[in-house]
């Protein structure tokens, strides 16, 4: 037995340090709910989790982008629906006005309402916007003809959706079923029977054009909706993978904390006894 160096005490102190460290780590994991709280816990795991968190954050942003794109297209579609309803009323007026039994005085009433509806068509086309992006008017210089939606967390992964130029139907030309062309809806009239007949045919083409435009918007909304589901599923899977690496097993950590707590208490008791060994040797020598 040696007196100058208390080997048992030194070993017990080291065990006490390790047991206290294990108990502290278990307590930290229980408090945070995470198995990895620093690179010391698992450097490789932390690197993987960081990459996964970056990816899931990007996917969540892409989901919001697509949802905003759907909102934008729904705004445009709603406006086109209003324009279609207006055109249907205009067609009704044109059909009524084409009746030869009406006098010019009778047609003045139709003309007044018909003209106000033309102005409302322009108003809808001019003012429909989403976040200051004009959705139905491509006549201005620099006007947007399509919107680009960032579809995923990868750079330049874009979904391009063409916008419908409803304003172009106002001053442009309309090709009728007969192959002839007439001016846009702003030039239509129900002032007499002939112009009313022509307006009826032109409005049919306008309604058909708007229906085609709505179909394109609907296709865009459908694609964006599927993209939302896709990126959401990817995000959920990525978060689940990160969780399996990063999150703590609470039951296991509680068991670890209890184990190290008992070992720490035992180490303290053993250290107290180990520190008394030199005194016991001295008493033995003196006796």
Curated annotation (Swiss-Prot):
SUPFAM superfamilies membership: Phase 1 flagellin
UniProt GO cellular component terms: bacterial-type flagellum; extracellular region
Compartments (UniProt record): Secreted; Bacterial flagellum
InterPro entries for this protein: Flagellin (IPR001492), Flagellin_C (IPR046358), Flagellin_C_sub2 (IPR042187), Flagellin_N (IPR001029)
Keywords of this entry: Bacterial flagellum, Secreted
Pfam families: Flagellin_C (PF00700), Flagellin_N (PF00669)
GO molecular function, one term: structural molecule activity
Chief place of localization: secreted
Functional description taken from the UniProt entry: Flagellin is the subunit protein which polymerizes to form the filaments of bacterial flagella.
Family label: Belongs to the bacterial flagellin family.
Protein name as annotated: Flagellin
């Amino acid at each position: 037995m040696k007196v100058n160096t208390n080997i048992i005490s030194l070993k017990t102190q080291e065990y006490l340090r390790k047991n206290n460290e294990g108990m502290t780590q278990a307590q930290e994991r229980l408090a945070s709910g995470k198995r990895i709280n620093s690179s010391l816990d698992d450097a490789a795991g932390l690197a993987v989790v960081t990459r996964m968190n970056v990816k899931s954050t990007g996917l969540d942003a892409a989901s919001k982008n697509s949802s905003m794109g759907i909102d934008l297209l729904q705004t445009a579609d709603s406006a086109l629906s209003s324009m279609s309803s207006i055109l249907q009323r205009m067609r009704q007026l044109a059909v009524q006005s084409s009746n030869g039994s009406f006098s010019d005085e009778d047609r003045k009433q139709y003309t007044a309402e018909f003209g106000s509806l033309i102005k409302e068509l322009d108003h809808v086309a001019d003012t429909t916007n989403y976040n200051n992006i004009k959705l139905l008017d491509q006549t201005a210089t620099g006007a947007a003809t399509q919107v680009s939606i960032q579809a995923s967390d990868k750079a330049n992964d874009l979904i391009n959706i063409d916008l419908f130029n409803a304003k172009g139907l106002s001053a442009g030309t309309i090709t009728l079923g007969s192959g002839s062309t007439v001016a846009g809806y702003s030039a239509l009239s129900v002032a007499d029977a002939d112009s009313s007949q022509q307006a009826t045919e032109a409005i049919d083409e306008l309604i058909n054009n708007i229906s085609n435009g709505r179909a394109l918007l609907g296709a865009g909304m459908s694609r964006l909706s599927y993209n939302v589901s896709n990126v959401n599923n990817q995000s959920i899977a990525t978060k689940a993978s990160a969780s399996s690496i990063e999150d703590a097993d609470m039951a296991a950590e509680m068991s670890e904390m209890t184990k190290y707590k008992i070992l720490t208490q035992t180490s303290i008791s053993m250290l107290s006894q180990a520190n008394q060994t030199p005194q016991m040797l001295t008493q033995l020598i003196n006796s």
